Every structure is written in C-alpha cells, then in structure tokens.
Amino acid sequence: MKPLLLLTLLGCLAAALAVPAQKVKWCVKSDQEFRKCSDLAAASPAFSCVKKESTLDCIIAIKAGEADAITVDGGDVYTAGLNNYDLHPIIAEDYGTSSETCYYAVAVAKKGTTFGIRDLRGKKSCHTGLGKSAGWNIPIGTLVSMDIIQWAGVEDKPVEEEVSTFFQASCVPGATRGSKLCELCKGDCSRSQKEPYYDYNGAFNCLAEGAGDVAFVKHLTVPDQEKSKYELLCRDNTRAPIDDYKKCNLARVPAHAIVTHKDPQLAELIWTSLNSVQNFNLFSSEAYAPSKNLMFKDSTQRLVKLPQNTDSFLYLGAQYMSIVRSLKKEQSVGTNSNAIKWCAVGHAETAKCDTWSINSVTDDTAAIECQNAPSVEECLKKIMRKEADAMAVDGGEVYTAGKCGLVPAMVEQYDAELCSSSGGQASSYYAVAVVKKDSGVTWENLKGKKSCHTGIGRTAGWNIPMGRIYDQTKDCDFTKFFPSGCAPEPKPALHCALCVKAAAKLSGDEAKCKARPEEQYYGYAGAFRCLAEGAGDVAFIKHTIVGENTDGNGPDWARSLKSDDYQLICPGKGPVPISEYASCNLAVVPAHAVVTRPESRSDVVRVLQVQQTFFGASGSDPSFKLFQSQNGNNLLFKDSTKCLQEVPAGTSYDQFLGSGYMEAMTSLRKCSDTASDLEKSCTFHSCQQT
C-alpha cells in the first residue's frame, strides 16, 4: 500500500473515532433555541440540531425518526405518549429543594386588585400555551372542577369555546388565531418564541404589561425583585404572597421531561451524552436574552434519570391524568357498561374469570367483565389507566397499588364466624417459615440454605422474611444469604434457580419463574410444593397452607403429604409443630384485599357484595364458586376466603396495612432494588402522591 494512501486512511479512521458513531438529534422550536443548540453541538459533538415550528411538530419528527429528543412540559408529555406518537419520558428536570422534580402551578395577579379565583369571570387572562400544564391544563381543569367554569363537555362545545366566553379576552398561544383566546397576544399566537407572550415569562409579561389581569404560570416565574408587586390567587378565594406557593397553588405537577422513542439504547445514549457535556451550561439562556427557558427551564439544577419502563401515564400520575381527561371529557374503555372489569393474571385465572362473567349475567347484562395481563403489576397498570377496575392482591401488592394511587375496597375474611358481623375484627393471617421435620434447619442456621418464596414483593413470601433478614444482616444482597431459591417475579432475574417449568402446556417454558399460576412454585401452595418436592430447605408462606395441602387435602401432588412431617421455625425458637403458628411466626399481616381507583370504590363494593350473595361460600347459586379453584390454587381469590368484607370508606393503603407492616416495608425499602419498577415509577415524584 502506498504511504500517502495509508496516511489518508489513518486520518479518516482517526476522524471517525473522534466523532460519536451516533449523534443525539435535538429538536428545537425557535431561532433562539437553534442558536443555543448549535452552540451545544459545537461544544459537544454528541449533539446535532433539528428545527421545527412547534412542540407538536417536534413530537411528530421524533416519531418519524427525524429527531431524537425534546424537553416538554407535562401536557406535552401526555400528548407525546398517545398511541399515535408512542413516545415516553426518560429524563426529568430537577429544580432543587424548592420543588425537586415537581413544580407548583399558580395563578398570579397584581397586588392592589381585589378579585379572587371565584371572581375570574370577565377578567383578562394570560396563559403559557394551549395544552401546557401550568398555563392551561391545571388552571382550566381546576376552574371546571370547582364549577367556576361551567362546561357540559365536548358534546356541547369545545372547552376552548367555553373558556373564551368565560374570560373577557385572553392570550393562549396555540389557540385558533383570530379567536378571543388570541386577542391579547402580541405576535402570531403560536406556541413558539414567535409569540412574545408564549411560555412562563411571556405569560408573566402579559400580566406585567397590563394586557391581562391574571397569569397562569409556575411558582418560580415571578422575578425576585418583582414579587412584592404581585399576589397568588388561592383555591379558597383568598390571596397570598408569591413565596407562599406551597400553601396557595392550583396543583403540584411533574417537572418537564425529555421524551424520545421507546428505545433503551437511544435513551442511554441521550443520558450519557447529556452527562458528558463540558464547558457549556445546559440550564442557562442568558447568552440568548431576552429569550428564556431554551431547551431546558432555566431553573433546572440537574437532570434525573427516570426508572425504566416509565411511560407518560406513570410519569404524570393519576391525579394529573384525571385533570387532562376532565378537559377532554374522555370516555374510558367500556364506560357504556355498568360491569366491573376484573383483571386476571395468566391463563388459569382468565378461564375462571370468564366463567364468573358468564354466570354473572342477569337480564342479558354481565355484572363482571374480564381483562387479563401477564402479571399483577400489569394488572395494576390497567386499573390505573381505567382499562380494568379491580383485582384481589396480597399485602405487598396493596402497598405497591397504594403507592400508585389505588385504594383497598374489600378484604378477604378467612373466619366464617366473622362474616356475619359488620365492622368486626379485621381479617389477618400469620407469615411463617416452614421446614421439613428433622431437617436440622433453624432460623439461626438459615444462611446458606435454599429458599422457596411465594413471589417477589409478596407479604408472607418475601417482604416479611426478607425484611427480618435485612434487619439482621443490613445487607441488601440477599443472594449472599440464600444463594439459591425460587422467588417468582414479573421479570425473572435473581432467585430463579429452583423454579420449575410451567405445568400448563399453553404457557411453555416462558412461564418459568414468572409471578403467575402457570409457574408451579408460584404463590402459597407453590412455595410449599417447592419445599415438599425437595427443591428448597425452607418455605415462606401463610400459616394455613400446610394444612390445606396435606393429610389428603389439596391437589394431586399433595395427596400423600403428611402435616406432621413439617415444622415451623422462627427467631429465638427451635422447630415447633405447625399448629403453634400463633407463638412461632414472623408477623401477623393483613389479609388480601381488592384494590381499585378511589372514584370506583363504591361501585366495586356494591357489585362484589351482590356477587358473593350468589357465588360466595354460602351463596344461593351453586353453578359457580367464587372462592374455589378447579384448575389451580387461589385463583382470583384465596381458596380459604369465606367472604369479602368492605374496607371502610376513606381508608388509605397505609392505614389498611397497619403501622407494623409499614415499618417492615420502610426497613426493606432501604434496599432500593426491592422496589418493583412500577413502584419506582409511581413514587419517583413526591407530587404523584395525593
């Protein structure tokens, strides 16, 4: 090879190595943003810039692959997550101690004016933009929910039309040009920097310059030197100083977030590229004055990576999604039906649910309809999204459901004598550790043994025993304590070595270690079977399981088992007979409960009370048994259930679980890996909690 050609090739190779193989194509919406983005690209070759006319155009470009990312507010996170775009948030802005990854939506008026929030009819309003969180979704949703704006719904007229008759005039960038919603605007009324009154500072300037009477912005918008001239409008019709935003606000909402395709590799590229930026301030727009909040909000202190699998719904939270739906008057799936949509996990539960649905029909109408999902977590997501209404879950799953805004509606009762008393003793059970008799296994020598668990995140099978073990060891790596085990989970990873292939041919090997009935060692009976068949040395289950699966009871695999061949172990005691669970247990824990959305609670209770009069333990219709399982164990409800009892209205998930259980969970959650992806997504923002 000639030396000149070789040098040329080496030069090309060096250039190729110096430039990232894939650049992050950032979408911008104005000339000023393009300037800042170009400066970023010059400072960091990991970026390139794509200019579009609006946020929606950027979302469409990302969907089409023309761009990779853009930072948007909550309203646009919602839009980006719709099926026709299918983008999801991967990184959130963090605003520091004043609000972390949330901010407050506030209504601001000039000091000296006297109107309150209930006196806004006929006033002139300034908004950050149509469909944006602080400037539109939250204030208009709040005014509608408080019946200040009286809107019958989209069947009557669009909400924009109702708002235009409520306010004397407005500037709502993104509204129809020439309408009253654009009357106060200074430029083209677009949702871009071409409109001087666009975004937070634009809406504030609309108020400051006297165009409007009220501005809907975020709590950090009013400059420090101007705060004494303005006041906040509170929901109780009073006013407060600007710095009292924590007590006087319309809502606390999730921070702006970066959205992109559902591509983990691209998400990681965006994250690492942003973190590698040097000699460039991502969160400052001073060099591009008077423009502000270019690419990122100027108040951003840092960026925070979101939990994996966070979608727009989980990021925004149920409360915010409810506000957006109220503005769109969205109908959830199946709302024309009065049936409760029950969520079943796996094939066996779905088959039982279908039978229940058929038997629930009266006057050609089913009281129960069935939805299904591959795991409890996926069912909980469906309930949150109104694709399903209810399901019965164990205490650990009540904890996760509660963190995601769901509430307990009814609880399983295992004592028939207590079924006839209303408001009687709450149902509970004992979490126990079971070993084979004469195995020599005790609580004190448990380390290094093989373990059988009902499932990751379950109460008796995981949360209680592993919480106890963490209290002893202060080590979050539980594989050091139990090097081998079976602990079924939605996404099998650790603790799967002892799990077995699925019994049901329909599921194949894919069900191995999955948290659903097709995994033979899943659930209470499954964990006991893991011990009985010699796979494990200890099973963490509830106190009734041995009796339900020995001495001729239970399914075929259990028929030859004897209860006397098993013992309980607990801290500070040698092995004791199974019958001594009251004195040798790991904890007394609340029974399984039916969870649902707060607004659906009364309907779920009403339907289930009727259903158990027909199909309960002493029901009038023998054609179907709600608390029996023919092709498995504990399908939909625990087989030991005698009745369902109402959980008092207003009971939160932590009140239901009790202080002891919550303390155990607080201890266990010191190990961050013990929280599921769903729980992490639901608790990422403090503002997601109502």
Swiss-Prot record:
Hydrogencarbonate 1 binds at residues 128, 132, 134-135. Pfam families: Transferrin. GO terms for biological process: antibacterial humoral response; iron ion transport. InterPro entries: Transferrin, Transferrin-like_dom, Transferrin_Fe_BS. Residues 1-17 form the signal peptide. Keywords: Disulfide bond, Ion transport, Iron, Iron transport, Metal-binding, Repeat, Secreted, Signal, Transport. Fe(3+) 2 binds at residues 394, 429, 524, 592. Disulfide bonds join 27-49, 126-206, 171-185, 234-248, 343-379, 353-370, 404-682, 419-643, 452-530, 476-671, 486-499, 496-513, 570-584. PROSITE patterns: TRANSFERRIN_LIKE_1, TRANSFERRIN_LIKE_2, TRANSFERRIN_LIKE_3, TRANSFERRIN_LIKE_4. It is found in: Secreted. GO terms for molecular function: metal ion binding. GO terms for cellular component: early endosome; extracellular space; plasma membrane; recycling endosome. Fe(3+) 1 binds at residues 73, 103, 200, 256. SMART domains: TR_FER. SUPFAM superfamilies: Periplasmic binding protein-like II. It comes from the Eukaryota. Residues 24-329, 340-670 form the Transferrin-like domain. Monomer. Transferrins are iron binding transport proteins which can bind two Fe(3+) ions in association with the binding of an anion, usually bicarbonate. This is Serotransferrin. It comes from Oryzias latipes. The gene is tf.
